[in-house]
Amino acid sequence: MNPTTDVLEQRVAALEGGVAAVAVASGQTASAYAIQNLAVAGDNIVSSTDLYGGTHNLLKNRLAQQGIEMLFVNPANPKAFAEASDGRTRAYYAETLPNPKL
């Protein structure tokens, strides 16, 4: 355990009124942790097509290995998110300032 990270996690938990917190080294890791806590094999996530390349790879390839299906939609059509959803949808994923659009 990194003592600096441990202090950060304790302080964030205290600020948020939580019992614990997790600090990670990148946004991509944070995204992976969040999705893996929401979805399991057989579930799906509806995602924008406009993503950082590494995140797109994570969602499309790595999560598929865990049995989590990704459904990619055009973010220019907000209704596409609802249309792609079904009873197995556990989350919607989008980047507010996607890397390809910066």
Predicted ranges, named:
Residues V12, A30, I45, Y92-E95:
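Buried hydrophobic positions in well-ordered alpha/beta secondary-structure cores of metabolic enzymes
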Residues N57-L102:
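PLP-dependent aminotransferase-class I/II
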Residues R11, A34, A80-A84:
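CheY-like receiver
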Residues A25-S26, D50-L51, A76, L102:
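Short beta->alpha linker loops
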Residues L15-V19, A39-G42, G87:
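Short helix-loop-beta connector
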Residues N37-T55, N74:
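Conserved PLP-anchoring active-site segment centered on the Schiff-base-forming lysine
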Residues M1-A32, G54-R62:
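Conserved N-terminal alpha-helix of the aminotransferase class I/II PLP-enzyme fold
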